[in-house]
Swiss-Prot record:
The lineage of its organism: Eukaryota, Viridiplantae, Streptophyta, Embryophyta, Tracheophyta. It comes from Silene latifolia subsp. alba. It is found in: Plastid, Chloroplast. GO terms for biological process: photorespiration; reductive pentose-phosphate cycle. This is Ribulose bisphosphate carboxylase small subunit, chloroplastic. Residues 1-55 form a transit peptide. The basic functional RuBisCO is composed of a large chain homodimer in a 'head-to-tail' conformation. In form I RuBisCO this homodimer is arranged in a barrel-like tetramer with the small subunits forming a tetrameric 'cap' on each end of the 'barrel'.
Length: 177
């Protein structure tokens, strides 16, 4: 069966009674009906104070202190801290994966001005992702194995969420001297 569609516009007649059904806009209402909480005393002594000491924040030094991942501003993770981070991603149900980079572990462009594959954003995967891993010491043992195979490489641990198919966590597990 075929159906027939029409492009003709349908015009309805409007009566004066219909026009009066909606009240005209009379402007915004006064704000006096709403409660207002204003602080009448603007004395500077009532503001938060640090006891008279003024400490300015320092700027991250851009030379010889490269930032790599989320926790790169912190000192190198101890073995205990590393195990806690690995345990966190395992508790979340993420799949641990190790990657390493021999050479500069930051984004650089020496062959071209535009971004590409060989500009330091992509690291080499160490073995396969550790699907089914439930123990943080297994991941730490793989970090040691990668560190022994490539002592001059940076090693990072990534946590993948295989349900959402995204990388959820990434941190440096080993930095060469």
């Amino acid at each position: 069966m075929a159906s027939l569609m029409s492009n003709a516009a349908v015009v309805t007649a409007s009566t004066a009674a219909q026009a009066n059904m909606v009240a005209p806009f009379s402007g915004l209402k006064s704000t006096s009906a709403f409660p207002v909480s204003r602080k009448s005393n603007v004395d500077i002594t009532s503001l938060a104070t640090n006891g008279g000491r003024v400490n300015c924040m320092q700027v991250w030094p851009p030379r010889n202190l490269k930032k790599f991942e989320t926790l790169s501003y912190l000192p190198t993770l101890s073995e205990e801290s590393l195990l806690k981070e690995i345990n966190y991603l395992l508790i979340k149900g993420w799949v641990p994966c190790l990657e390493f980079e021999v050479g500069p572990a930051h984004v650089y462009r020496e062959n071209n001005k535009s971004p590409g594959y060989y500009d330091g954003r992509y690291w080499t995967m160490w073995k396969l992702p550790m699907f089914g891993c439930t123990d943080a010491s297994q991941v730490a043992a793989e970090v040691v194995e990668c560190k022994n195979a490539y002592p001059d490489a940076h090693v990072r641990i990534i946590g993948f969420d295989n349900k959402r198919q995204v990388q959820c966590i990434s941190f440096i597990a080993y930095k060469p001297e």
